């Protein structure tokens, strides 16, 4: 009996520690957002002396927003940069979009590369290789096709690239779009995702997504260049790790990496979350324990039980109050990341928040059930440590 009592006391202590850690993450993310995001960065060097940047743009297929998203990169207010458009397939309709923009902006240093170069299983790396090999500037900016920028985005990122910084990344967010699926995405990327993303980076953990990353090319080359990361599906994590292992720091842009895909749905969002969870479990096995207990509903039950065990508080009352506080703080976080008025109502937020939180266990269990992922045009079986093998149809 004494052993059981000791175990229960230990579980209660764990519940209170979980409470402190999760709410510390809430406060860190909100404070950082208020102090850093959506602020104009201080110019650290004269405009004319800003270093050259090679932009690598991987393209696959066309959606309704592609041409508008791409055009924002041709309209950057930056003294010296090149745009390297990379398309894998010769019959990809994205080629026509690229040619249209190349004709419209003849004064922009831009080139189109078709065909890619097979160097590993990662299709994004294979697509980018021809552009990477001819990149002429010391800074490489890898930016996904669905990202939209404003004229001073690149200037902001380069200003963060100080002497000891080797990688500058943007916090992923989502542009205002129509429909509930867009609201669901915006709620996720404005609440749960930045809470973990920001708190991890603030506390020294290297958490980077490859949607918009500015890196020193010489540091990447020291690590073996892009080809060294072609064996991984989550190439962004391993590129960031290689840069950190060489003693370089990371910095976050004051502007978000604004996703503006024209193709979106609830099922696409769910599939994307499952894929990301599979990758995290594969790279960081501790995710199996940490991820479920850090979500609102599960965490509230654990902490509620601890409060009941120690203070005899009603579990369900505590659960409801804790979820309500989480819900309110998430809304504060979302407004901070948005940097302005939201395009949906508080009722839409409440519904999207509840559905997103309710999906978490299903997403996690689905990721555990099947270790294979589908990405772009291929299917891959994940291996322990982050590598993968392509599943070929016989």
Swiss-Prot record:
- Motif (Q/R)XXRW covers 272-276
Q: Which SUPFAM superfamilies match?
A: Nucleotide-diphospho-sugar transferases
Q: Where is this motif: D2?
A: 144
Q: What is its main location?
A: Golgi
Pathway assigned to this chain's UniProt record = Lipid metabolism; sphingolipid metabolism
Catalytic class of the enzyme? transferase
Q: In which tissues is it expressed?
A: Found in all tissues examined.
- In terms of domain of life, where is this protein from? Eukaryota
Task: Indicate how the chain sits in the lipid bilayer.
Answer: Multi-pass membrane protein
The signal peptide, as residue positions, is none
Q: Where are the transmembrane segments?
A: 11-32, 196-215, 288-304, 310-328, 349-369
Lumenal side residue ranges read: 1-10, 216-287, 329-348
* Motif D1, residue numbers: 92
Q: Name one Pfam family in it.
A: Glyco_transf_21
Give the catalysed reaction(s), semicolon-separated.
Answer: an N-acylsphing-4-enine + UDP-alpha-D-glucose = a beta-D-glucosyl-(1<->1')-N-acylsphing-4-enine + UDP + H(+); UDP-alpha-D-xylose + an N-acylsphing-4-enine = a beta-D-xylosyl-(1<->1')-N-acylsphing-4-enine + UDP + H(+); N-(9Z-octadecenoyl)-sphing-4-enine + UDP-alpha-D-xylose = beta-D-xylosyl-(1<->1')-N-(9Z-octadecenoyl)-sphing-4-enine + UDP + H(+)
> Which residues of this protein are catalytic?
236
Tell me, which GO biological process terms does this entry list?
cell differentiation; cornified envelope assembly; epidermis development; establishment of skin barrier; glucosylceramide biosynthetic process; glycosphingolipid biosynthetic process; intestinal lipid absorption; keratinocyte differentiation
- Record text on subunit structure and interactions: Interacts with RTN1; regulates the ceramide glucosyltransferase activity of UGCG.
UniProt free text on domains: The D1, D2, D3, (Q/R)XXRW motif is a critical part of the GCS active site, involved in catalysis and UDP-sugar binding.
Q: Which family does it belong to?
A: Belongs to the glycosyltransferase 2 family.
Kindly provide the name given to this protein in its UniProt entry: Ceramide glucosyltransferase
């Amino acid at each position: 009996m004494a052993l059981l009592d000791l175990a229960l006391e230990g579980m209660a202590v764990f519940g209170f520690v979980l409470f402190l850690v999760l709410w510390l993450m809430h406060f860190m993310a909100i404070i950082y957002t208020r102090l850093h995001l959506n602020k104009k960065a201080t110019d650290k060097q004269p405009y004319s002396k800003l270093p050259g940047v090679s932009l690598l743009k991987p393209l696959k297929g066309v959606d309704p927003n592609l041409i508008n998203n791409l055009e924002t990169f041709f309209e950057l207010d930056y003294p010296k940069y090149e745009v390297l458009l990379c398309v894998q397939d010769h019959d990809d309709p994205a080629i026509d979009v690229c040619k249209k923009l190349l004709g419209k902006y003849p004064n922009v240093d831009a080139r189109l590369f078709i065909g890619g170069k097979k160097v590993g299983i990662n299709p994004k790396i294979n697509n980018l290789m021809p552009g990477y090999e001819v990149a002429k500037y010391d800074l490489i900016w890898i930016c996904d096709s669905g990202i939209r920028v404003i004229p001073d985005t690149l200037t902001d990122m380069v200003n963060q690239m100080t002497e000891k910084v080797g990688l500058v990344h943007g916090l992923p967010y989502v542009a205002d779009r129509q429909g509930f699926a867009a609201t669901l995405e915006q709620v996720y990327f404005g609440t749960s995702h930045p809470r973990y993303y920001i708190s991890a980076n603030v506390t020294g953990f290297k958490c980077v997504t490859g949607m918009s990353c500015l890196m020193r090319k010489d540091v990447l080359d020291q690590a073996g260049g892009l080809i060294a990361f072609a064996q991984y599906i989550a190439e962004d994590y391993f590129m960031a790790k290689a840069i950190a292992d060489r003693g370089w720091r990371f910095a976050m842009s004051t502007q978000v990496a604004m996703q503006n895909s024209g193709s979106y749905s609830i099922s696409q969002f769910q599939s994307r979350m499952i894929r990301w969870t599979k990758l995290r479990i594969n790279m960081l096995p501790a995710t199996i324990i940490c991820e479920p207990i850090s979500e609102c509903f599960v965490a509230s039950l654990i902490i509620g039980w601890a409060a009941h065990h120690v203070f005899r508080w009603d579990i369900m009352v505590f659960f409801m109050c804790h979820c309500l506080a989480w819900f309110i703080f998430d809304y504060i976080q979302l407004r901070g990341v948005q940097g302005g008025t939201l395009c949906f109502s508080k009722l839409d937020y409440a519904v999207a928040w509840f559905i997103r939180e309710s999906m978490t266990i299903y997403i996690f269990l689905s990721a555990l059930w099947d270790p294979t992922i589908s990405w772009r045009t291929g299917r891959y079986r994940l291996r322990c440590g982050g590598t993968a093998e392509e599943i070929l149809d016989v």
